[in-house]
């Protein structure tokens, strides 16, 4: 009797495999990419709602970085954009180790041929030549192909008598191409000088981030310079400047709002209003002749 009283209770052994199967079968399946966390306010956002709102957080107004496809979708009249020069191939002029492999890997990953896409399309029925930089391709860095594509686009705009709009998003010159990369600053700036001589409109839209050699050249040469809210815009990094001058810089230093306040840009335009504002500017310029 006492022996039965203190007998060890029998229990069922559940294998780890059964536990994992149970969890898998009873856990709701949520597809990847359905929810996105806002990196400014921390709110979890539904991807479809975010896309309908131009990739802008509806709670804090944070403008997510967007690529070429989204920019074309939000800017142009449907099915009017025609891409130019997408077959120009990136070379390795300095035989920089690993550069060829890196370019091929990024091409496959992003489905982009380079850090800028150029072409012609219609905005509210009006034609314009547009260059769109994409930070997903080597941080939008400017190499020989980027400079060549933008220069060709400007030259075609002169022949077609069309305005030029450039959306900047770049970390600056591409170090793997050395001095040839830096040369693109002068090359694009020279083409823009010819555009100006022809009396044609150049609008630059600064997006997050616009830095380095791009800022030091064509990004700041626009007849009209627009920017998206809270965009990082500058030449050298904030910490580099602070270490150089041994001073603490303002918290909002190099933000588009700071630049507007100090007269470096003309207007900050929310993404939802950008198409309307650009159409108005193009129309005003066309009607002034």
Swiss-Prot record:
Q: Name the positions where Zn(2+) binds.
A: 38, 41, 57, 60
**One cellular component term from this protein's GO annotations in UniProt:** acetyl-CoA carboxylase complex
> Which reaction(s) does the protein catalyse, per the Swiss-Prot or TrEMBL entry?
N(6)-carboxybiotinyl-L-lysyl-[protein] + acetyl-CoA = N(6)-biotinyl-L-lysyl-[protein] + malonyl-CoA
SUPFAM superfamilies per the UniProt record, alphabetical: ClpP/crotonase
**Its pathway?**
Lipid metabolism; malonyl-CoA biosynthesis; malonyl-CoA from acetyl-CoA: step 1/1
Q: Which cofactors, if any, are listed as required?
A: Zn(2+)
The domain of life is Bacteria
User: What InterPro entries does the database record attribute to this sequence?
Assistant: AcCoA_carboxyl_beta (IPR034733), Acetyl_CoA_COase_Trfase_b_su (IPR000438), ClpP/crotonase-like_dom_sf (IPR029045), COA_CT_N (IPR011762), Znf-ACC (IPR041010)
**What processes does the entry annotate via GO biological process terms?**
fatty acid biosynthetic process; malonyl-CoA biosynthetic process
Q: Which UniProt keywords apply?
A: ATP-binding, Cytoplasm, Fatty acid biosynthesis, Fatty acid metabolism, Lipid biosynthesis, Lipid metabolism, Metal-binding, Nucleotide-binding, Transferase, Zinc, Zinc-finger
Query: What GO annotations for molecular function exist for this entry?
Result: acetyl-CoA carboxylase activity; ATP binding; carboxyl- or carbamoyltransferase activity; zinc ion binding
Q: How is the cofactor bound?
A: Binds 1 zinc ion per subunit.
CoA carboxyltransferase N-terminal domain: residues covered: 34-289
Q: Where are the zinc fingers (C4-type)?
A: 38-60
Where's it found, cell-wise? Cytoplasm
Concerning PROSITE patterns, the annotation shows: COA_CT_NTER
On assembly, the entry states: Acetyl-CoA carboxylase is a heterohexamer composed of biotin carboxyl carrier protein (AccB), biotin carboxylase (AccC) and two subunits each of ACCase subunit alpha (AccA) and ACCase subunit beta (AccD).
Q: What does this protein do?
A: Component of the acetyl coenzyme A carboxylase (ACC) complex. Biotin carboxylase (BC) catalyzes the carboxylation of biotin on its carrier protein (BCCP) and then the CO(2) group is transferred by the transcarboxylase to acetyl-CoA to form malonyl-CoA.
What is the name of this protein? Answer: Acetyl-coenzyme A carboxylase carboxyl transferase subunit beta
Q: Identify the taxonomic lineage of the organism of origin.
A: Bacteria, Bacillati, Bacillota, Clostridia, Eubacteriales
Name the encoding gene, please: accD
